[in-house]
């Protein structure tokens, strides 16, 4: 009886076959990129030819080291291993290395990196540094044994003897060359006594010059504090190092000439010309001063020097007169001020105040005596008048003169209106009193 396998069992069997097949552990494959969409980490796409398609995967760490970007339709050569993905029962190639297919592979990498760095702005003119006019020490990053360093030393020594050349022996092609170039550029920038840096090598194929197209080298040049001259290959060779460097030289000799724009002969010639111009300028100044001295010696002041002081003497007399007037005015003002202050002090003196108060007290004492006398006289007169009035009111005196006083209930009757018939009244007379009864009341017609 036939035994049926499950899908899982079959898939696991196929995976085991794939994993144990030595041929599938390292496959060399060429194909065209299809269904590619760049992702931030791992890349998943297809490789195809005219008759078949296989899924492909590149892990992010591998992809970052490729040196170029995948593009839709690009033909590439890859090395990888084939594996089965059990959940879907599909197989794919896990790519470990990849490069563009054909002669233009490096050109593609060059253009892609150039585009990337251009977009970042590394090649912009605003980042270029000016080369120094005079350099005391120049650093050179190149091979120890190449013709480059010999040409640079010869040219610099000829143009400006005394300039120091500091060589950083560097591997300029092959594996590890780019890292060593970048490392020596960084080392040179750590020194404070370098004025300029030249990097370069002689001519060669694009593969020979490729280290100077690596991103690590380009960024090292961009980050250099020192101005950098690039001299890589022949005049027709162009590298990314040339784009990012502050200046590009077609040959090592040209690089040395750029590094020493002013030669020793130029300096000597300039100094000689300056010496001549200074001598001419001194002669001209001396001639002008002599002419001025001659004119001065012929002037009236030198012939009659006493006239030089006429104006000053007149001015001095005027100032002396003004000074005397000013002093007299100030003395007079100060005298008046002293007198005024003296008068104020006298007025404010305690003795003066006491004297004023004593005078005022005497005046008030006299005024008080006068007022008291007046008040006394007035009071005496008033008392006399009141005494006379009291005497006039004394009943004994009234009746003594022959008058009689009528009283009703101990009250003096001064009007008939206060009486009525049958009222009992008392009539006071000089020698006694009479008790009477009112019989009739008659009002006097007025």
Curated annotation (Swiss-Prot):
Gene Ontology MF annotations: exodeoxyribonuclease VII activity; nucleic acid binding
Listed Pfam families: Exonuc_VII_L, tRNA_anti_2
Subcellular location: Cytoplasm
UniProtKB keywords: Cytoplasm, Exonuclease, Hydrolase, Nuclease
EC id: 3.1.11.6
InterPro entries assigned: Exonuc_VII_L (IPR003753), Exonuc_VII_lsu_C (IPR020579), OB-fold_nuc-bd_dom (IPR025824)
Catalytic reactions on record: Exonucleolytic cleavage in either 5'- to 3'- or 3'- to 5'-direction to yield nucleoside 5'-phosphates
Role summary: Bidirectionally degrades single-stranded DNA into large acid-insoluble oligonucleotides, which are then degraded further into small acid-soluble oligonucleotides.
Family: Belongs to the XseA family.
Full protein name: Exodeoxyribonuclease 7 large subunit
Organism of this sequence: Streptococcus pneumoniae (strain Hungary19A-6)
Primary gene name: xseA
């Amino acid at each position: 009886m036939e035994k049926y396998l499950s899908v899982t069992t079959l898939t696991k069997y196929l995976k085991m076959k794939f994993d144990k097949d030595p041929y599938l552990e390292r496959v060399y494959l060429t194909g065209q990129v299809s269904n590619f969409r760049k992702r931030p980490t791992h890349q998943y796409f297809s490789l195809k030819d005219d008759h078949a398609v296989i899924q492909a995967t590149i892990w992010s760490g591998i992809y970052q080291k490729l040196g170029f970007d995948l593009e839709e339709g690009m033909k590439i050569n890859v090395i990888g291993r084939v594996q089965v993905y059990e959940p879907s029962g599909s197989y794919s190639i896990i790519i470990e290395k990849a490069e563009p297919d054909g002669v233009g592979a490096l050109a593609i990498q060059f253009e892609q990196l150039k585009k990337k760095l251009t977009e970042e702005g590394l090649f912009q003119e605003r980042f270029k540094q000016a080369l120094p006019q005079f350099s005391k020490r120049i650093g050179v990053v190149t091979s120890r044994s190449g013709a480059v360093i010999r040409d640079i030393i010869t040219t610099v020594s000829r143009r400006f003897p005394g300039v120091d050349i500091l060589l950083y022996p560097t591997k300029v092609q092959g594996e590890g060359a780019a890292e060593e170039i970048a490392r020596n550029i960084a080392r040179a920038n750590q020194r404070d006594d370098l004025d300029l840096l030249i990097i370069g090598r002689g001519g060669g194929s694009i593969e020979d010059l490729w280290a100077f197209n690596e991103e690590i080298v380009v960024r090292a040049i961009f980050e250099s504090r020192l101005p950098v001259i690039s001299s890589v290959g022949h005049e027709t060779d162009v590298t990314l190092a040339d784009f990012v460097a502050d200046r590009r030289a077609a040959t090592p000799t040209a690089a040395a000439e750029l590094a020493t724009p002013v030669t020793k002969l130029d300096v000597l010639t300039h100094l000689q010309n300056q010496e001549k111009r200074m001598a001419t300028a001194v002669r001209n100044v001396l001639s002008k001063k002599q002419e001025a001295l001659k004119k001065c010696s012929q002037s009236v002041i030198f012939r009659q020097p006493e006239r030089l002081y006429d104006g000053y003497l007149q001015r001095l007399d005027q100032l002396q007169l003004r000074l005397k007037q000013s002093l007299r005015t100030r003395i007079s003002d100060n005298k008046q001020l002293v007198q005024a202050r003296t008068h104020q002090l006298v007025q404010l003196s305690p003795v003066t105040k006491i004297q004023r108060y004593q005078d005022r007290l005497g005046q008030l004492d006299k005024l008080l005596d006068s007022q008291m006398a007046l008040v006394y006289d007035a009071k005496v007169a008033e008392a006399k008048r009141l005494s006379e009035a009291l005497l006039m009111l004394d009943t004994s005196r009234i009746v003594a003169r022959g008058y009689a006083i009528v009283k009703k209930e101990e009250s003096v009757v001064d009007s008939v209106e206060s009486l009525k018939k049958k009222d009992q009244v008392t009539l006071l007379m000089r020698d006694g009193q009479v008790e009477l009864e009112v019989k009739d009341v008659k009002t006097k017609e007025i």
